[in-house]
Amino acid sequence: LLHCHDPATGATRTHMFHVPVVALSLTDQPAHLLVALGSGLILFDPDNGVRQDLPAKLAGWPDQRLNDGRSDPRGTFWVGSMANNVATDGTPTPVRDGEGTLYRYRAGGEMTVMETGIGISNTLCWSPDQRHFYFGDTLKNEIRIYPYDNNNGDIGAGTPFFASFERGLPDGSAID
């Protein structure tokens, strides 16, 4: 489900999707959202409900699914995957470690693999000075830090930033 609320009118519209909605981002196209579904990326117009498939389909679907995503300071969309933990009938299945991938999606359809071997992709954010990228693997109970080049959107090798949380697991992040 995707709920769209208009604060000016108080109206809320709900849009149904047949796969999980895992993340979304504004685009440079008026009235269009970039929506990360479990199966891949689409452009979506919430005003009329029109969905446009993008060439960025998840190759491992339905055995893998997208899980979390966010736009970087340049407006490039990053999204991570994991082993699908929901069977086609809706029942839970075990999560398999190491089957997730971190992708960078650029307008025009370029989907680049940035890292592999991830358990559960979660918690993407960038430092305020735009020099570092943080990315979490919930299954490994770890957040990694990567050098980030804001000129081209590339990352360097990641190193552990924080690991082995005693309470809770990394899932969602923000820096202010």
Where are the predicted features?
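A short loop-to-beta-strand structural motif that recurs across blades of beta-propeller domains
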Residues: 1-3, 40-42, 94, 100-103, ...
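Short loop/turn segments immediately following the C-termini of beta-strands
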Residues: 38, 82-84, 138, 148
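Short, conserved, GDST-rich strand-edge loop motifs in beta-rich repeat architectures
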Residues: 79-97
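Flexible "stalk/tail and boundary" regions
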Residues: 7, 29-31, 46-47, 103-110
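A short beta-strand motif characteristic of beta-propeller blades
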Residues: 10-16, 52-59, 109-116, 158-163
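Short loop/turn segments immediately following beta-strands, especially the blade-tip
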Residues: 47, 146-154
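Beta-rich, blade/repeat-based domains predominating
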Residues: 1, 18-34, 60-76, 83, ...
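Beta-propeller domains
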Residues: 1-17, 38-43
